[in-house]
């Protein structure tokens, strides 16, 4: 009987612990006491937002969204790509409004992780942090490799600057040693040395850009924002060049039929374009570094989405007006649609500038992704889930330098060891999960803490958060129904996160609580002795 009682008590205490909610006032007090330097204004936030959103998607994915994939697994929207972009924008705006409410109410580092801790408890917060690491850290690695691909493609117009083994992604990551050896055999002109029969190559451009971005972030968010601003200006200028130059050669007959594959093609296009909008959520992780988060963050988040949507719609109109997307299209259009169209118009110089624009776009995305990853981990360190050493700020730059370098060096390891096709698929699930959690958290905190000041409130709640949950949940279900192994790997990733929490995060938090309790007891003893 006693054993049964102790078991019930243990279970009750365990459940109480893992559902422990951290009061938002406590979060704000911690941020005020030992927070990051406040350097970001509304213009900086819009620059970071546009920099994070407009990346490789508009330069590459838009071709597949318009014409469909080469293997026929994804239908194209055709000229109705404009409608697909607006649908994707609405799907994002519901979640963006929820992020804005939280970011103004609890303007501290951590984003969705912090909001979950304030509403759903410790274990849920850990799991969201674990999922966000998948989204930001793995996304950072994947974008670095994409940057390398664009860089090598850009150099191909000149003399070979780098030997193949220093510019080729590690071929052993394809599947196995046999597949890697076959790649080398099928490409005899690409000289890649071998060691014990295994091809040896290092993606040097990806590694170097990761180290460069890390150094810039260590110097501070203000310097990072300046660089992001330059990159945003370059890519917007290149996109404007494409729109203006291409508009004179648009053939209206290419817009007929408007939706060659009907609603199915429009929604398939919206699903692909959705990922060209991802990045606005990273702004919420920088809330602690905003000068006036209550006013500036909603403008930054919503403003960057509106600007991006306008840019995307203009590109879609010109692109589908230049190329007939109702039937088969060249493979070059699917890989680099904007550059292909400029080449077909005999504007090779413009195609070269578009390549530069894609590099600039990816560079700004890298900046925001690594910054977001470090701010999530910084918040988790503050909550004693990981080592408190990562809380230490650089004495000169007031940035989490040790944490930033740790993320950067782990990214280098990931570039050499991860199968990025699978990793990128997993990132999509991480994104959907974090969006859904934030929408749910808004509804919960409206009930549990209705009197808390909300400088920005989600309009038409609870309808807006519910629509965000439905849109993201529907896209997540749609994605899981596609033939891909990542749908099975995501629950495995969550399982690993739960195990690490139980064996490390949970234990470390309890040890810290005991330490704080002992310190309080000792303090009371000293006060009594006085």
List each language-model region with its residue ranges.
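Transmembrane helix-loop boundary segments of multi-pass membrane transporters
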Residues: 63-82, 132, 143-149, 155, ...
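Membrane-helix boundary/coupling elements in multi-pass transport proteins
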Residues: 59-62, 108, 131-149, 272, ...
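Loop-to-transmembrane helix boundary motifs in multi-pass membrane proteins
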Residues: 42, 203-207, 291-295, 299, ...
